[in-house]
Amino acid sequence: MLEKDIEAYLVKRVKSVGGRAYKFVSPSNRGVSDRIVCLPDGTTHFIELKRPGGKVSPLQDMFAREMALLNQSYDILWSKEEVDKWISDHTSTTPQIFCSPATAP
């Protein structure tokens, strides 16, 4: 399985739970995560995707440590199964209803 397949699967799964998975490209900052995931509960997560057997570069490792120091959520996912587990761990099983303040009960 290729990294791009796992990445496409992450995007699809995040959308299926009402979130967004933005491609993160920062030309002057190599090593940043592949995606920034924003979930409906208001949380933001930095996600690096790797194919099984892939390697984390020293710059990616440095970015992971920086995110930890900043108390940010950072994960490396290595397969579609790990994507599914990550989604399960980070989303509620209770449906969430969002409305504007004007229509709130």
Q: Which residues does each PLM region occupy?
A:
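Catalytic phosphate/metal-binding cores of nucleic-acid and nucleotide-processing enzymes, i.e., regions
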Residues: 1-105
